[in-house]
Amino acid sequence: MKTEPGQELEMLQKENSILTASLHRRSFLQYAGAGAAGIALIAAGCKKDHGNDMPPVNGGVTLDFKDDFGVLNYAYALEQLEAAFYIQVASNPPSGFSAIEKQYFQDIQYHEIAHREFFKNALGAAAIGSLAVDFSTINFTDRSSVLNAAKAFEDLGVAAYNGAGVRIKTDAYLVLAGKIVSVEARHAAYIRDLISPGSFSGPDVVDATTGLDQALTPDKVLAAAGKYIKTKVNVINL
């Protein structure tokens, strides 16, 4: 049985406080307060190893975009992917990472865990299960490989939220999605700065005419993410 809409909105509003904090380019990671302890307040139920405690998906999943549950589960699927990636990086960072880079990636890990748990709790019984991921194409011992993978995930995440916004029917969900994507955009800018200091962004993600970040439809996002998601994800009613 799905969570009642009123209960969902109340839960979203209560748990979203961490996403509304003011962020600065170099100190944005501080918005998590006391790090893991601060995140734990909204990531209640997250295991000590930061894993997703939802049962694994058997076969595949179908995301039905006829209502907001489909859009929220779409975001939840992508946050599962990002959280899994950063958990692996933070648990065993490349030897080429500096001490501050290790700390930043650990903090980003907590952000993504918070996002994942946020959507899981908002969806309640309507949430999809845990997706199986495959990071075999990423060399987690190599700094460049990890940074380029992180760049791909963050850029894709921003484009995904931008493209899904028009499909959200509930105003409160749209506002909260906007707050989450602003955090993802800060992640993306930071990763790009690590790869090429001072770059911040680029014409591959920001339209030179409009000055807006790229927006991608769910089918295009999932096609790109499919490289890392073993579970078959289908979409209907786009």
Model-derived regions: residue spans:
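Hydrophobic membrane-targeting alpha-helices
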Residues: 40-45, 49
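All-alpha RGS (Regulator of G-protein Signaling) helical domain and cognate RGS-like helical scaffolds
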Residues: 2-8, 15-18, 33-34, 49-238
